[in-house]
Structures are given as structure tokens and as C-alpha cells.
Amino acid sequence: MNFKEGEVLYFDKPLKWTSFAVVNKIRYHICRKLGVKKIKVGHAGTLDPLATGVMIICTGKATKRIEEFQYHTKEYIATLQLGATTPSFDLEKEIDATYPTEHITRELVEEALQRFIGRIEQIPPVFSACKVDGKRAYDLARKGEDVELKAKTLIIDEIELLECNLPEIKIRVVCSKGTYIRALARDIGEALNSGAHLTGLIRTRVGDVRLEDCLSVESFPEWLDQQEIEEVINE
């Protein structure tokens, strides 16, 4: 392996880790293994701290391929709690409002999900990395400032209802770059004349890379020790 020339690695991001923390940890182990102070390492698509699953990490010259990977179709398994919302649309923030769910049936859920298939407009969450006048939306939101984000056009190829244990549902979503599953949860809640927030999220696929192809961050140092590494010549 030649991490400077460029390698593409697949990881299962651990729960509560930021994407940035995963990149830092992988960079640390690679630098330590190679005996160098720095090497380029980047990820091809952020996952929220409360999400787990497929994360593609590129090293060295392969970081030029990051944009290519970002455009790959993604698949998620999401668990939604109906009848309650949070400001972040997931469990990062406390419940701020509750709504009735007595009227919701499996048929109603199936029907609502169908409305989101195809090209849709989605307003990103204010607790997101979207930029407003050059500043991250989440930085402004955490300061208590009002944040207005514009709707983005995206494509949802598939939505499948996997489990329906009302008021909780589990769905599989296949979607394009830029889709916020947290925002989709919010919109599904509204489509059901209720509210909803995300209680679990796993990214199961990015392009052809599946969860079973991924290394754990924990096992990476051991895996690294078993690889044949090309020596890095400091320029």
C-alpha cells in the first residue's frame, strides 16, 4: 500500500464520533505507521455524530477523488419516532413539541412515503454544515440566531417501509448527494399531519461500497500492521 500515492479506505463510522474525528484517528495511525508528521487524509461525505455506517476515506493523491465519491448514490436505514419533534430533527436536541399519532396507520405511512420518491425540494436542517453568508448554519443556530436556508433539489430513488411499530417506523432510503435524512424525517412527520424525528441512522451503502466491506476504526491499527506498506521518501 502507498498512502502518499493514494489509497481509498472504507470504514463503519462509530456512534457519537464526528466524521472529522474519524479522519483524525486514521491520519494519526497512518502517520505513526509511516513515521511521518503529516499526510493528506479526507472523507467523502459527512455522517452526523448520531449516525453510523459507511464512510469513505481517501489518502494522499486519492483525496482528488473525494468529489467523485460524493456524487455516488447512498442508501440508509433510518428509524423515526412519530409524534414528536426536536430542533435538530434527531436525538442531539431534546423534544420541543408533541403531536397526535392516533390517526396514523400503516397504510397512511406507506402512502406518505410514496410522495417523496423522485425529484423533491428539501430545506436542510438549521443544525447542518450548510453555509449562510460564509458561516456554518449550525454555528449560527447554536448561538440562537435565526437561520433561513433555501430549499435544495435532490433525488430520492427508493423509500421502503421496513418496520411499522407505531409510533415508530423503520425505512430504507436510496438517495442522491445532499439528502438530509433528518430533514426527510421532519417532512414525513408533516406529511402525516404529525411530527417526527430521527432516532437511528445507518448508512448502509455508498455507490458499490457496502457496510460489510468496511473496517472498524478500532481494528484499523491491527489491520494496518498486516499490510505491506511502501516506504515514504520525504521530499
Curated annotation (Swiss-Prot):
EC number of the protein: 5.4.99.25
Taxonomy of the source species: Bacteria, Pseudomonadati, Bacteroidota, Bacteroidia, Bacteroidales
CDD domains the record matches: PseudoU_synth_EcTruB
Gene Ontology molecular functions: RNA binding; tRNA pseudouridine(55) synthase activity
Catalytic activity, as annotated: uridine(55) in tRNA = pseudouridine(55) in tRNA
Pfam families xrefs: TruB_C_2, TruB_N
Protein encoded by which gene: truB
Active-site feature positions: D48 (nucleophile)
Organism: Phocaeicola vulgatus (strain ATCC 8482 / DSM 1447 / JCM 5826 / CCUG 4940 / NBRC 14291 / NCTC 11154) (Bacteroides vulgatus)
Gene Ontology biological process: mRNA pseudouridine synthesis; tRNA pseudouridine synthesis
Keywords assigned: Isomerase, tRNA processing
PANTHER family, A to Z: PSEUDOURIDYLATE SYNTHASE TRUB1 (PTHR13767:SF2), TRNA-PSEUDOURIDINE SYNTHASE (PTHR13767)
Function: Responsible for synthesis of pseudouridine from uracil-55 in the psi GC loop of transfer RNAs.
Protein name: tRNA pseudouridine synthase B
Enzyme class: isomerase
Family label: Belongs to the pseudouridine synthase TruB family. Type 1 subfamily.
